[in-house]
């Protein structure tokens, strides 16, 4: 995975933030009565789903000695999300036009042909067909 950029925290000029007195610090290891009885639980970190790990794996297959910045990874992730959304929307419209409630590989293939230009669409369709064939043969 790509290394994360170091986050800078805003400086408070050596002073405690407004509304918090220095005496309010909690000791580590001691639980409050509410936490011990199970009334309130801390929320865990919300997970952000990205294509970063997959983009990184493809990069290493193509150019093993090349890295990628966090900003570039973010841009590529946005790009993949955008294309995915366009293809899904178009496939949904095609299914609705044909009065079908299920999006099949045929709708995906047609939407890719409509969205992507020329040679790019041909390559995408051939790679998609290859992936579906590989999946179908391994599932049996």
From Swiss-Prot:
Q: Coiled-coil stretches, from where to where?
A: none
Output the PTM entry.
Monoubiquitinated by the ubc2-bre1 complex to form H2BK123ub1. H2BK123ub1 gives a specific tag for epigenetic transcriptional activation and is also prerequisite for H3K4me and H3K79me formation. H2BK123ub1 also modulates the formation of double-strand breaks during meiosis and is a prerequisite for DNA-damage checkpoint activation. Acetylated by gcn5 to form H2BK11ac and H2BK16ac. H2BK16ac can also be formed by esa1. Acetylation of N-terminal lysines and particularly formation of H2BK11acK16ac has a positive effect on transcription.
The UniProt entry's GO CC annotations, sorted and at most eight, read: nucleosome; nucleus
Biased amino acid composition, Basic and acidic residues? 1-10
| Record-listed N6-acetyllysine modification sites | 8-9, 15, 25
- Point out the cross-link Glycyl lysine isopeptide (Lys-Gly) (interchain with G-Cter in SUMO) in this chain: 8-9, 25-26
- Please verify whether the record's keywords include Nucleus: yes
- Could you tell me at which residue positions the Glycyl lysine isopeptide (Lys-Gly) (interchain with G-Cter in ubiquitin) crosslink is annotated in this chain? 134
- Entry keyword set: Acetylation, Chromosome, DNA-binding, Isopeptide bond, Nucleosome core, Nucleus, Ubl conjugation
Q: Tell me the superkingdom of the source.
A: Eukaryota
Give the primary localization class: nucleus
The question of whether Secreted is a record keyword is answered with no
Compositionally biased, Low complexity: which spans? 11-21
**Gene3D superfamilies of this UniProt entry?**
Histone, subunit A
Functional summary from the UniProt entry: Core component of nucleosome. Nucleosomes wrap and compact DNA into chromatin, limiting DNA accessibility to the cellular machineries which require DNA as a template. Histones thereby play a central role in transcription regulation, DNA repair, DNA replication and chromosomal stability. DNA accessibility is regulated via a complex set of post-translational modifications of histones, also called histone code, and nucleosome remodeling.
Name the protein family.
Belongs to the histone H2B family.
Q: How does it assemble?
A: The nucleosome is a histone octamer containing two molecules each of H2A, H2B, H3 and H4 assembled in one H3-H4 heterotetramer and two H2A-H2B heterodimers. The octamer wraps approximately 147 bp of DNA.
Recorded protein name is Histone H2B
Which species is listed as the source? Emericella nidulans (strain FGSC A4 / ATCC 38163 / CBS 112.46 / NRRL 194 / M139) (Aspergillus nidulans)
